[in-house]
Amino acid sequence: LTPVAPDALAETYGGGGGAFGRHFDAILQARRRESDEFYAGVIPKSLDADATNVMRQALAGMLWSKQYFYYDVNRWLEERGCDPYLPSAKRAPRNEQWHHMYTSDVISMPDKWEYPWFAAWDLAFHVLPLTLVDVDFGKQQLDLMLSENYLHPNGQIPAYEWNFSDVNPPVHPWATIYTYRLEAALRGKGDTEWLERSFQKLLLNFTWWLNRKDRAGKNAFEGGFLGLDNIGVFDRSSPLPTGGYLEQADGTAWMALFSLNMLEMAIELSLQDRTHADMVLKFIQHFVSIASATVHAGGNTGMWDEEDGFFYDVLRLPDGQAQRLKVRSMVGLLPLCAVTVFEGGFQEKFPEIAKKFQGFLEARPELKTFIHDPTRMGHAGRRLGAILDEVKLRRVLEKMLDENEFLSPHGIRSLSRFHAEHPYVFNVGGQEYRVPYLPGESDTGMFGGNSNWRGPIWVPVNALIIRGLLQYYAYYGNEFTVECPTGSGRQMNLYQVAEEISGRIASLFLRGKDGRRPVNGGEQKLQEDPHWRDYVQFYEYFHGDHGAGLGASHQTGWTGFIARGLHLFATTTAEQVLELGKGAAFEEVNPQEAGSGTNPAPR
């Protein structure tokens, strides 16, 4: 507020006016005015007062969640008798493979109260709202995870402090290409040097995934934990009680998205330097192979279930048998998110790449039969990299948009409500494993017991679904419509579906017609007291039926995406998406003229 030390305030500004001197109020009001002016340039004017308040508090929470993080892992391990070069009878409690890691940085935390340590995949989501107010800080956060002090020499990105060797979803490439495009829109030119540097480091991470998580070399990936805590039948970070291993629908979908994001970067870099053109072909081939494995690998015991029209994890046993674990969860929706639309024209600029890719498909014609045909042109000559063809996309959307399954009043649930009456049960070795629908808090101690992916709404995966729907819309256009909600008789194009889901998420925080905010649940003080009711908390996750906030109560972190969601649909129209493709999300427009200008609550 002032550069003057507290004990010099009276002498500098004069006595009176309380402990801070008589000029304190004027200084405070000046800072308030400056803050108001800053946010007025960020928050779209088409948002109403309540939505404006929510967006501003979400952004403020993102900035408040910065924290200095110091951790000398080598020193910590040495104090516990762990030497990187000598075998030791005393095993370190954790992170004994991370002697190289040394952190002394300001990092965006998930929740400075409950989770005062970074998590790699959380951080990637943090960048989306953070870059609305500070692009440079967002880039710096992404740089940290790829720096020599963090990235393992083998290419692994550290997961989180409790176990750096655990595996988080590889969303770093997505955040990287997103940030590059946002900065290019804001400043008129993308930072290709930064993109090139990030691309080279992410190549190491991609190779680590290929070498460590594709056990059979068939592009069907494992991954383990992958950030979704208790979503599976078993603890995915531990050995299976059955023996064998899991082929994970989400792990394979994440790698398909990773390939697409790397392909986007390679194309962008090739436009500046043709020596990257071979990388374009490399990642096209990777994507097609991984996407085909998601749909086809294993034949009748692959991840795609033709009868159910859904994706499941596959348990592969030591004796060669395989079984789908038929849990309808976010795991089966994530393949929908592995999609990217590409503008036309690249083939003309790089005919040699187009020719080589065509030869690759002619040599492997079966690959194209299982997934969306990547050579088929859509709206405005665009092409689509997607696991799901139109038929499979409609089948998955039918379940996702069913209010008796995934679609809640406040977003997409992490587990289908179908399992409320039909819990999934798996018996092995005399022990029963159950996955019921739990819309609130967890009923087990798995991963500490303070999070739950068996029914609640989680904002980050909803963000990925919204992104995916907009990619499909830019390709299919207005002709592709689905019932939303399923069974309602109301047809929507995919832009409208994305906007509907975003509006339902926003309704968690906005006052409803009854004046109450679902996030505050039954807390009457928070709902009714004028001193509390307009101060919004951004929880870790939300009740799958009524939307009450659960888990860490100050996790603006990835829940801070709501700021980006509000901004996106207030500044981007369906017409712009059809005209500009994914570039529409970064188009700078007058907020008063942009978007529908409607309240972002459910329609």
Language-model regions: role of each:
Residues 1-603:
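Acidic, mature catalytic/reactive cores of soluble proteins
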